[in-house]
Every structure is written in C-alpha cells, then in structure tokens.
C-alpha cells in the first residue's frame, strides 16, 4: 500500500521513521550476536560454583533509537540492575561491592588473583571477539537492513 506524502515535513518524518527502524534492527541483531559470544565464550565453560543464573548474558540490551544532532543512534550497554546480587558470594553483593570495577571487564580480561569474590580466572574474551565481529560485519549488516526499507544511509560505528 502506497502512502501519499503531501509535504516536505511529512516526507522527513517518514524517512526518520525508516531510519529508526533500520537502526533498531541493527542494534537488535548486534545485541543478539553479543549474547551469542557470551554463550560461547563465557557460558561454555563448565560450571564449578553452582547456581549459574545466566543473568550476565541477559544483562545486555540496546536503547530505542533516538535522533541526536541529525544522527539516529542506539546504544548497546550492560544493565547491571538485571543481575541478581544476593548471597555472600554474589559478585558485587553487600559483602564486596563492584563499584570501581566492571563485571564485563573481569570476565573479558580475567583476573590474576582473587578479587571481588572472584577466584583468579582466565580471560573469556567475549567482548574482544564481539568487537572483531562488529568491526568486520557492521557495514554489511547496516547496508542489508537499509535495503529492506529501500533507503541508503551513511553509517558509523563508535565504541565508548
């Protein structure tokens, strides 16, 4: 079904909606791929401590696309509020808060010695592996999603 556009403003609104859909789809796919890397690199290791919740993998999410100075952006981030912090040996519990150190960094980079209720662990480079994938596949993914909506958009990938 065709849509009749009666003004430049209406056309811009329609283009903006398409751009948001493209960015939303790209962010969703990239977040799903990050969770795949977490499953492979983090959760494929045998459970030795009991009670694995999977909360770390489920804590990653993307924001709804927003317009910011002529750009549409979505942010993929870790939401630590989704991780259960109960029990004396939960990472970041009241017994040992993780205020200065990021759980993702500990898992990705490993620890040489026990800290924050973690034993010394080898690195499980889910983030490094996802970044390599993202740097290689982002352009193709973005182009593919743009074509689904019949538009071509400039794209950039940035990491903070």
Predicted regions and their residues:
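Short, Lys/Arg-rich flexible segments
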Residues: 1-75, 80-81, 95-160
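His/Glu-rich zincin catalytic helix
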Residues: 84
């Amino acid at each position: 079904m065709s849509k009749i556009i009666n003004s430049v403003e209406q056309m811009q609104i329609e283009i903006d909606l398409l751009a948001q859909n493209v960015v939303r789809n790209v962010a969703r796919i990239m977040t799903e791929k990050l969770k795949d890397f977490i499953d492979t690199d983090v959760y494929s290791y045998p459970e030795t401590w009991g009670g694995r919740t999977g909360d770390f993998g489920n804590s990653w999410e993307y924001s709804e696309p927003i317009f910011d100075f002529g750009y549409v952006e979505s942010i993929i981030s870790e939401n630590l509020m989704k991780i259960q912090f109960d029990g004396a040996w939960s990472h970041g519990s009241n017994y040992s808060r993780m205020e200065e150190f990021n759980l993702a960094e500990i898992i990705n980079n490993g620890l040489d010695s026990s800290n924050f209720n973690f034993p010394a662990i080898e690195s499980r480079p889910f983030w490094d592996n996802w970044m390599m994938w993202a740097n290689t596949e982002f352009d193709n993914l973005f182009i593919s999603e743009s074509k689904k909506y019949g538009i071509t958009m400039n794209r950039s990938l940035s990491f903070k």
